[in-house]
Regions:
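AAA+ P-loop NTPase nucleotide-binding core of proteostasis motors
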Residues: 1-241
């Protein structure tokens, strides 16, 4: 909503920076080291696109030296890359994601405490185990996400289905789906670990049958593919005869 497009998003997967030797790739290798002529993967992107959203995914996997770099960025709003150029982060929005505490959210809430309160307390406790106090103190807000509900998952399923529309429209085909189909897809999927499993159900229900029908010549331009739900509440693909 900030930029109305995903283009300004700079996503950094912290699983690629678990080792000490990989940390220098963020701001570039120092003089005399391999890769000195190459720009830092973080600093160069921000230098070229100063108005960006920077996402550090799964921050708990990063090497401690990465935290030192981030601490300087959060504290001063800028950092020097390996070429000696000052990169300004004052116009960026920095987000960090973490799975801290996600494996220990099944305890009883107790009297007078909601599930969200308990979840936030466990998440904060887990964050404090790998983030230093001075780092946490420079974070503006810590947001704890609640488990996805039925309505949330149906909206996500709709977005996933919409991704198929441009490809089908390029072949002259139209995709339609009903609200009952969205509910059926969610009910057919095990969403205990989030919404990623929805894509498997959609692939099995929509993508594979439509691809087979196109290859077999049963679908031609001007036809409509409809995803609905049968009498048992299962997702059902209706192909034109």
């Amino acid at each position: 909503q900030l930029f109305d497009t995903v283009d300004p998003l700079i996503s950094i997967d912290m699983s690629e920076y678990m080792e000490k030797y990989a940390v220098s790739r963020l701001i570039g290798s120092p003089p005399g080291y391999v890769g000195y002529d190459e720009a830092g993967q973080l600093t160069e992107k921000v230098r070229r696109h100063p108005y960006s959203v920077v996402l550090f995914d799964e921050i708990e996997k990063a090497h401690p030296d990465v935290m030192n770099i981030l601490l300087q960025i959060l504290d001063e709003g800028k950092i020097n890359d390996a070429q000696g150029r000052t990169v300004d982060f004052s116009n960026t929005v920095i987000c960090m994601t973490s799975n801290a505490g996600s494996s220990d959210r099944t305890a009883l809430t107790g009297f007078g405490r909601t599930e969200e309160q308990v979840s936030r307390e466990k998440s904060m406790k887990a964050l404090q185990e790998f983030l230093r106090p001075e780092f946490l103190g420079r974070v503006d807000e810590v947001i704890t996400f609640r488990p996805l509900e039925q309505a949330d998952l149906e909206k996500i399923a709709a977005l996933m289905l919409d991704e198929y529309k441009p490809g089908l429209e390029a072949r002259g085909l139209k995709l339609e789906y009903t609200p009952q189909a969205l509910a059926a897809i969610v009910n057919e999927t095990s969403t205990r670990f989030g919404a990623r499993e929805l894509r498997k159900t959609i692939r099995k229900t929509l993508e594979d049958p439509v691809a087979e029908a196109i290859v077999a010549g049963r679908l031609t331009g001007g036809q409509t593919v409809t995803l609905a739900a049968d009498a048992d509440g299962k997702p059902q693909l209706v192909l034109p005869e």
